[in-house]
Amino acid sequence: MKLDYPKIALIGVPTDIGAGHRGASMGPEALRVAGIADALRSRGLEVQDYGNLQGPVNPWQPPVNGYRHLPEVVEWNRLTMDAVYDSLNRGELPVVLGGDHCLGIGSITAVARYCNENGKKLRVLWLDAHADFNTSEVTPSGNI
């Protein structure tokens, strides 16, 4: 029995706006250079790479009221939410190539919205180096 998988939509989100150190913004290109699209295709999956989203630059400022770069984080996540939601509406499986951990705000919001509108159960696979459970009251860094 052959399974029918949706097209994979690679969405690059090259930002380190929610991180305390530079480098996460290189993630999408590093994954592409490492051959993520070819690795998926070699497993029989159809892949569409939509390139990178373009968002605000990182001002590298200290936290304000417990949050670092809140307006920029909001904008990157609005862009991410729109791209992921559009991908789901095209019947694709979005794979967000980040970027830093704050992108869960936009990507998971898009999936939750899509699932709610279509009577589907929300499922998220999150791959990260560590758990990111901070609030403005407990974060030592101000990272969102």
What does each of the following model-derived ranges do?
Residues K2-I144:
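Conserved alpha-helical scaffold segments that buttress catalytic/binding sites
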